[in-house]
Amino acid sequence: MISEAPVETCNQFVFLAFPRRPGWKPKGEQPGQVLCTRPSGRGKMKLAASNNSLLCFSFNLLWSAAMNHRAAGLTHFGMQHDDIIPPLEWVDILVDDLEASSADVISSVVPIKDDRGITSTGVRNWLTGEIRRLTMHEIFQLPETFTIEDVHAAGINADPNGNPADEYLIVNTGLWVCRFDRPWAKKFPGFRTQDQVRIDADGRCEAVSLSEDWLFSEWAARNGLSVLATRKAALGHWQDGKEYRNDSAWGTCQTDPGEVVKVT
């Protein structure tokens, strides 16, 4: 668990990235859903949007733009997906937790868009490839902002037969902030996905994938970054007029049903 002490800062300068998809109008920008238009109430911000259907390329365009602006004194990089409806001043909420803990990355918990209450936040064992996603029921058994150590303390492991030291926190890129004034930011090679078709034990073809957010999480862990996940910024994940929210324990699944195919 991290400190709850707020951090007062006058030099906060956030590059806020908005990856967009061609032809898609973000629901958060419609009348009555304008909360995302004031992400911060302090410091300076530089806003940038991309418009590309290639997800990782879109992210990398924005990260590159931020890197090229880094000399102007950027302190943080943040990102909001076009289907996320966050609270007012969500950037400040995340930055306060980030600074209070001296962590490198903080990511909001985002439920998947169905009635199960499964999130894309979880734990992964990088030796065995086992993944366990956290459900909204489990999220509310953890501190409001938590680390991989908090997850293990709650008895949750990606691989019950593995070594907890080989596990790391996997987080989402829907609504997140990172420190941008630390040396690691210049070393990050960019976002990517890992996709393949392979033959399973029964001789059948199967498609497997590791998403860009989970691969970023792996890179962060391998490079010694401190990563946090949080539900402190109460948000909605928008789909067809409905918000799948992260501010209560809900869903038909108490635990991950284990449907994610491991990739090693």
State each model region's role.
Residues K25-T75:
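Active-site-proximal specificity loops/subdomain of glycosyltransferases
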Residues P87-I199:
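Conserved catalytic core of nucleotide-sugar-dependent glycosyltransferases
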